[in-house]
Amino acid sequence: MKKIFFLGLLVLVFTACQQAGNKTANVDNITVKTGKVDSCCMLKDGIFLHISSGYENPHKVLMALKMAVMMSMDKDVLVYLDIKGVELVMKTSKDMKFKDFPTLYELLDQLAAKKVIVMACPTCMKVAGYKAEDLRPGIIVAEKDKFFNFTKGRIVTLDY
């Protein structure tokens, strides 16, 4: 008997939860269907691309930057470079080419044109002997607050 009561209560709660998200409102003879909170308040998700590879792995680097360009069409994007990746974004950095990918310079220019945040790790820069003034135009020194403030939605991370 307790099992049947509990099962009935569970069905009742589930049904109530389902209906709570699908109400209609009638205002001035206009019927508006109100959905669940997540469907009415859709926030733009963010893509966090982490690049620790450098010139030793052009496939990884250029794939990550190409993904950043593609994702920036409808997502907030932040590119973070550390370890060997910081070597790619200096004024003295050489261009990189790999198979059918656009070059490093082309991809960085596309990201700059789309106003995508590209940050370099300050500790990794220091270890490699670089300073903030060595960064290419448009590249900034990483700031911890920007890791979370670049988007209002969820953050998806891709690691290269």
Model-derived regions: residue spans:
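Histidine-anchored nucleotide/phosphate-binding helix
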Residues: 60-75
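A glycine-rich helix N-cap at a beta->alpha junction
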Residues: 95-124
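Short internal beta-strands
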Residues: 68, 77-84, 118-122
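C-terminal partner/receptor-binding element of secreted or periplasmic proteins
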Residues: 137-160
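Positively charged n-region of N-terminal signal peptides that target proteins for export
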Residues: 1-4
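Short, glycine-rich nucleotide/cofactor-binding loops
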Residues: 42, 49-62, 89-93
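Bacterial Sec signal peptide processing site at the extreme N-terminus
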Residues: 18-29
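C-terminal motif of bacterial Sec signal peptides marking the signal peptidase cleavage site
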Residues: 13-16
